[in-house]
């Protein structure tokens, strides 16, 4: 398979992946960036964090995004390689993404810089080939703030097999979302995940009343979802399907910060589902 010189791609050939299939193929597409924390910078971006955790739990994980042709871009690709994250990363003439993160009592707030590389992800033939073989694909709303990445993410996600898990991990940041974007994404997804703050935003945005369960079932029926997943921080997490509800309390831990906690949850959830757990 020929690979564009614009693409940094460290993975097996599609033929090798198809032949082995010893591990589920999990794809994350969206923002790849540096979180600029008080303690220093850390590689991040929700879909890429998801891929990392899914890979640690046994998946054949792949990240799809874009970086700038700059030092930060080189460093973040090196970071992916160091952590054995396979990737399809395009180099584009925009700076590598950064996010300023401030922590108050371990809770992060974000200042997300605009006109960066991950606003310009392209639907390469390699990315489409990969999506067609995916057992699960994860995408969010943040990386869809630009028209180009929005069209790319929706196009690539649409190539995932019908029986694959298509996880929409809502990430409502700053002003980078609206009802139209969320609805477009919901029609592509079959699993919807959000935290309790995002739940309240969506309930207001869609003009819904009723209990948490009633709202969850409304989304499931309206958009044909397999499940609705809600995380509530230190309290609990709940998974709703048409037939069942499963709630677990959050284990007590010493919190350093919660950056990426939701992505770790998503990775563990998808791997558990792919292993046949209920």
Regions found by a protein language model. Name each.
Residues 2-85, 99, 255-256:
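Glycine-rich phosphate/adenosyl-contacting loop at the front of the ribokinase-like
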Residues 3-25, 210-278:
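Conserved phosphate-binding/catalytic region of the ribokinase-like
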Residues 8-12, 115-122, 172-177:
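Short gly/ser/thr-rich secondary-structure transition/capping motifs
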Residues 54, 195, 262:
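Short, conserved phosphate/pyrophosphate- and ester-handling motifs at nucleotide-, phospho-/glycolipid
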Residues 60-141, 159-162:
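Conserved N-terminal subdomain of the carbohydrate kinase-like
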Residues 129-130, 184-185, 221:
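Structural alpha-helical scaffold elements that stabilize or flank donor/cofactor-binding regions
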Residues 136, 140-214, 236:
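Conserved beta-alpha-beta core of the PfkB/ribokinase-like small-molecule kinase fold
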């Amino acid at each position: 398979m020929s690979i564009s010189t614009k693409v940094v791609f460290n993975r097996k050939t599609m033929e090798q992946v198809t032949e082995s299939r010893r591990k589920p193929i999990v794809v994350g597409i969206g923002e790849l960036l540096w979180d600029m924390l008080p303690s220093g910078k850390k590689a991040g971006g929700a879909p890429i964090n998801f891929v990392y955790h899914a890979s640690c739990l046994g998946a054949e994980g792949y990240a799809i995004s874009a970086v700038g042709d700059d030092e930060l871009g080189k460093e973040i690709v090196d970071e992916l390689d160091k952590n054995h994250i396979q990737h399809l990363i395009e180099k584009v003439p925009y700076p590598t993404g950064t996010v300023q993160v401030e922590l108050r009592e371990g809770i992060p707030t974000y200042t997300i810089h605009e006109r960066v590389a991950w606003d310009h992800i392209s639907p390469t033939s390699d990315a489409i080939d990969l999506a067609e073989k995916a057992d699960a694909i994860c995408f969010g709303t943040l990386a869809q703030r630009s028209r180009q990445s929005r069209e790319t993410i929706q196009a690539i996600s649409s190539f995932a097999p019908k029986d694959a898990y298509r996880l929409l991990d809502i990430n409502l940041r700053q002003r980078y979302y609206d009802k139209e974007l969320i609805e477009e994404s919901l029609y592509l997804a079959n699993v919807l995940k959000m935290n309790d703050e995002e739940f309240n935003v969506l309930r207001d945005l869609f003009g819904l009343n009723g209990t948490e369960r009633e709202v969850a079932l409304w989304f499931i029926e309206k958009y044909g979802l397999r499940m609705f997943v809600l995380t509530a921080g230190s309290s609990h997490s709940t998974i709703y399907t048409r037939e069942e509800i499963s709630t677990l309390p959050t284990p007590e831990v010493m919190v350093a910060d919660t950056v990426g906690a939701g992505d770790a949850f998503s990775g563990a959830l998808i791997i558990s589902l792919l292993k046949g757990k209920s």
